[in-house]
Amino acid sequence: MGTASSLVSPTGGEVIEDTYGAGGGEACEIPVEVKPKARLLRSSFRRGAGAGPGSLPRAAGGGGLLGASFKSTGSSVPELEYAAAEFERLKKEYEIFRVSKNQELLSMGRREAKLDTENKRLRAELQALQKTYQKILREKEGALEAKYQAMERAVTFEHDRDRVKRQFKIFRETKENEIQDLLRAKRELESKLQRLQAQGIQVFDPGESDSDDNCTDVTAAGTQCEYWASRALGSEHSIGSMIQLPQPFRGPEFAHSSIDVEGPFANINRDDWDAAVAGLLQATPLFSHSLWSHPVRCYLIYTDETQPEMELFLKDHSPKLKRMCETMGYFFLAVYFPLDVENQYLTVRKWEIEKSSLVILFLHSTLPSFLLEDCEEAFLQNPEGKPGLIYHRLEDGKVTCDSVQQFLDQVSNLGKTTKAKIIEHSGDPAEGVCKIYVGVEKIIKQDILGLENTDVEEKDGGREDSTPEEDDFGDVLWDIHDEQEQMEAFQQTSSSAHELGFEKYYQRLDDLVVAPAPIPPLLVSGGPGSGKSLLLSKWIQLQQKHFPNTLILSHFVGRPMSTSSESSLIIKRLTLKLMQHFWAVSALTLDPAKLLEEFPHWLEKLSARHQGSIIIIIDSIDQVQQVEKHMKWLIDPLPVNVRVIVSVNVETCPTAWRLWPTLHLDPLSPKDAISIITAECYSMDVRLSREQEKMLEQHCRPATTRHALYVTLFSKMMACAGRGGNVAETLHQCLQCQDTVSLYKLVLHHVRESMPSDRDKEWMTQILCLINVSHNGVSESELMELYPEMSWLSLTSIVHSLHKMHLLTYSCGLLRFQHLQAWETVRLQYLEDPALVSSYREKLISYFASQLSQDRVTWRSADELPWLFQQQGSKQKLHSCLLNLLVAQNLYKRGHFAELLSYWQFVGKDKGAMATEYFESLKQYENSEGEENMLCLADLYETLGRFLKDLGLLSQAVVPLQRSLEIRETALDPDHPRVAQSLHQLAGVYVQWKKFGDAEQLYKQALEISENAYGADHPHAARELEALATLYHKQNKYEQAEHFRKKSVIIRQQATRRKGSLYGFALLRRRALQLEELTLGKDKPENARTLNELGVLYFLQNNLETAEQFLKRSLEMRERVLGPDHPDCAQSLNNLAALCNEKKQYEKAEELYERALDIRRRALAPDHPSLAYTVKHLAILYKKTGKVDKAVPLYELAVEIRQKSFGPKHPSVATALVNLAVLHSQMKKHSEALPLYERALKIYEDSLGRMHPRVGETLKNLAVLSYEEGNFEKAAELYKRAMEIKEAETSLLGGKAPSRQSSSGDTFLFKTTHSPNVFLPQGQS
């Protein structure tokens, strides 16, 4: 077939020359491609056909494939046939291929058409969707725009509403301020009138309205009317150094100079008593620190001879005293030192004697000289009158040395001026120590804790008062430890001797008080340690001194996360302070949110009735967590007479508060800072050189070195350096410290280096760390149990050194850091490692957990253990601790409801889970036996019920309260007072649940039990009456509510407040003890007056027997010193008569009143208020005892006195005329009573108006008189007019028409034979 040396180009049909020459070789394989092959064959045949027979062959390079082939090989038929066959085959294949491809093209065309159709459809759908989307998007935008517009309108409306509310409140308070100004002007005019009349100038003002104690005041609708009966006791104004009572004008009894009246407790009314309690609560700094020291601190002094007795006392009896004090919530410390022959610890011993509340001396035959000085200071030089106990062991044949006998004689010669008691014993030492224990127990109960009459009263009553102590507070949960802490904080902050540069700040604070309302709170700002607390405490003292009518409520916040920084406890405490000034102590919710809502209402309520200003001071308020959330009431307009002052650090002040009026405390001037330091140095006989003074001046240029706390620490360091003799070195070290924390680090280093041993240094470090990681501090007794190997000498020396350098202080019996910078310094110095913090917390946890395992649940373990678990993040342990019902009970009963709730929230339990788990925990107590255990179980159920009630789980609260009721009825008696307590609590739940019918039944049952157990005039019965009054008021049954409220008030008037029902009575008791110490000298008028005041104080405590003793001693001393006809003797007689009247000894009271009246008639002017006072109460007594004939001339004399004092047309004269007319009506002398009634009616109508309630009362009395004379038509007319006045008053008061009684508390009821329902005449004061 020839070679394939040339090929046709597939693209151009050209021949491709063989590049390898003419040499033969194998033919190249043509690629199998249909189109090039067909083209190749067609062209070959065309060329072959064109040549035909006879045509010339082409050149070698230009022929086709066949030609070439033929040329090279010649023609061959088989090959031609083969080629034709190949051609046909290829042609068929081509046709097949073409047909298939055409079909594919048609199919693809159809698919393309279909896809185009689908594409168009999808495009149309997409366009429709896009249009829908655009429409929806436009609708959404429109809706959002509408929403934003609506929100803007809502915000605008809310702002407008708040603005209107604020404007209205401002308007209302402005008007109230105007009213207060008018009332203040009225009181000033009345005061001027009193002074003029005291000078003998008669001033007649017929337009003056009657202002007797029981004059009816028409108040706004819904205002609660309150009553207080007059107390017939008087005393001079020497108590005014502690209590200044407002003396509003109240008729002839207070018409003259206040110097001449009976005193602050004469004719005492409700407002005066509130002011007295406020004064007592504010007079805390007047009492010595030892009286307020929370631990019962016994300092033991012994000799070598009596050391066995001392050790026996510590071993056998000290634990019993400790348990007794723990039960009452106090610490007991028995402190003793080793015998200090060389007087190495003289300073520490003196400091311990000064702190102690009781000194016990164990004495035998000798008294070493180094102990004699301590004994003389403890027993002979005892200005505070602290109790002491001397145990003198006698022994046959052994002579007591002269020093011992002389000391005992000196103590004995002091007599009643000392409270030292000597116990002489000659038998078995164990018996002598037992006598010491009995004496110490009695001193603790009577002299230290003020429980002097508890046992006596129980014996006298013939029954045991088993009502728990906290029930004396009613439904109010009061924490005495929190109050104690605040009192001590105020004492400590106000005890500084240096207050340079504060005068300008005092003036700014004074301007705030007198500034016109409304005014936002004043912000006192400054750097750490700038003296904010000192400024506020000193200013409080000045306010109490110069403005005794100002009520000041203060709270000093401690370090962060302590109890004093809990916002809910702050609000609760301030609310309780406000509630103390109201007669009925109502239930107080413990829900933090509700407390925050109710506090402004209580504040507004008190401001409306308080005559002076109310100032609320919160120091370091920025230490309160989430302060802006929990103190929202600060941003609202305050009542007119309320001012608020808060102090903050500049760095931590909330941003929203920075717009308030601000008083910024600048650092001390360099001159003042240097003067304080040099003065302290001079006091220690340290003289700085001129060069050292220049260095000090240069050091005091920066502001951080002139803060008050920094300067104080600097001066203390220099004073200590003077005692140590290293002034230059200490000065150099102090000059390196540029802020308070760095100076505290230096102080800490110096104190540590001053410790006598490495062991003491280690103890000091551990004590500081334990105090730092604790919740509220650590007590000395707890430290002694944590470190048994530590002696009292070591502990006292460490505490004394730290206390002296302003590192530690005492608060509520606990050791705490004196300043926040001291706490921060210890944290930076020793506790930067979290593992160390955790280890110290675990040490405290182990200690308090061991107490729980021994069933010793005290307020300390309840305060510390849950908090420590929370800080450690131990949820399981905290959960187990909370399920200890005694811990939960302790927290709840002290009002720490919010704290308890936060622990449960930390554990992750809701309200329902709490209730369920507490119910499960109570099941383990159900099998307890014995009355004591059953009563404990009942108390736990009651606490749980009250807790659930405060949570709002009323249906679940009913179950435990009913269970508590069942247990008490079973274990005690159905008529026991504790059963009444359960009924009262259960009824309270039903009231909150709106089940008034059930509540009414329970309250009435509790009232019946209380009256049977205590008597109808006991405060427990008054509490049930108040609850019933509140219940009826909620049901709009105003007449029944008024009836029960009146009965309750009468009981309160007769009994005053029972001892212990207010925390202020502890102050009264201790004030009484101090006054008693002042009366033990010679007979002097001052001592007689003090004895009279003591009688008044004990009378206010309802301790009538003791009051009678002091009043009798006052009378006897005055008769000896002043003579029996002196007016002061009349005062004592008058007070004794009032006391006998209270005891229902009417004959004795009558005799005393007559003697007092006789003296005052001879000694005083005819219109003197003291004479009018005696005349009034003697006339009331005559009337009460049925001696009407004797009462008539006294009532006539009262009319004359009032006419001389006020003029013939004064309403007070009309009141006296009505009382005289009522008396004549009782005697059936209608002709003499009628003109008196008519004259009184004319005076009332002219001065008070024709629709005044006093006019209505007089009309009613005239109607009675006309009825008894048979003139029924006139009686009906008068009675109709009286009822019209009463109805008008009732509608004005919203359906609550207050009752009106005479000042004597009497309402005269006449029964006639004409009708059993005849209206009754009324007397007036």
Curated annotation (Swiss-Prot):
InterPro entries: NPHP3-like_N, NPHP3_ab_dom, NPHP3_hel, P-loop_NTPase, TPR-like_helical_dom_sf, TPR_NPHP3, TPR_rpt. A lipid is attached at G2 (N-myristoyl glycine). TPR repeats lie at residues 467-500, 881-914, 916-937, 938-971, 980-1013, 1022-1055, 1088-1121, 1130-1163, 1172-1205, 1214-1247, 1256-1289. It is found in: Cell projection, Cilium. Residues 107-203 form a coiled coil. One of its GO terms (cellular component) is ciliary base. This is Nephrocystin-3. Pfam families: NPHP3, NPHP3_hel, NPHP3_N, TPR_12, TPR_7, TPR_NPHP3. It is linked to Defects in Nphp3 may be the cause of polycystic kidney disease (pcy). Pcy is a recessive disorder causing chronic renal failure. The Pcy phenotype can be slowed by diet modification such as protein restriction, administration of soy-based proteins, administration of methylprednisolone or treatment with V2R antagonist. In contrast administration of bicarbonate/citrate has no effect. Disruption phenotype: Mice show situs inversus, congenital heart defects, and embryonic lethality. Interacts with NPHP1 and INVS/NPHP2. Interacts (when myristoylated) with UNC119 and UNC119B; interaction is required for localization to cilium. Interacts with CEP164. Component of a complex containing at least ANKS6, INVS, NEK8 and NPHP3. ANKS6 may organize complex assembly by linking INVS and NPHP3 to NEK8 and INVS may target the complex to the proximal ciliary axoneme.
